[in-house]
Amino acid sequence: DGYFVLPFTVGNYLGEVRTLPPLAEDHADVSQAVAAVEERIKKLMNAPHPKPAPEHFHRLLGKIIWTKCGMSRSKEGLEEALREIPKLRDQFWREVKITGSGETLNQTLERAGRVADFFELGELMWIDALKREESCGGHFREEYQENGEALRDDEHFSYVAAWEWTGNPSEPRLNKEPLSFEYVKPSKRSYK
């Protein structure tokens, strides 16, 4: 639907490749993408037991993110969240209520699509945070600190994590791009 949140560098890249010729409407990739979107809309519009609006699930998911995967995280909280999210996501797909039609502009449908995406993104955030057994920047783990200071593990976590979609939001594949430090070496920081 044209809604993107991207790092600045990705936008620059897309700006450079926009000169590629557009795909024809009957191209296999276009047909496949259209069919996938239509199937998703149909699934969203036809929840078996529609009750609450997308905002209800958005609030519940947001509360879990805020309390269990905020700036300060713990293994226990992350594991608990990873048990809660699939249950809430299943409830969302069974019960989300979308008024109106899937054939015209429908802001409730747009919101539901975003919330469905947030479930996948949120779960990935928790998986990544649980796997990163250190405290560094936005990855502060309560069990990895020393005298109140973040305890980094540069030996095991000096990499860029690129998570790959496998078709199951609970089982992404981690691809690591090692970081090399030629000019400036990592050093211990003090926030005191």
Regions found by a protein language model. Give the residues of each.
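Glycine- and aromatic-enriched mobile tails/lids
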Residues: 1-192
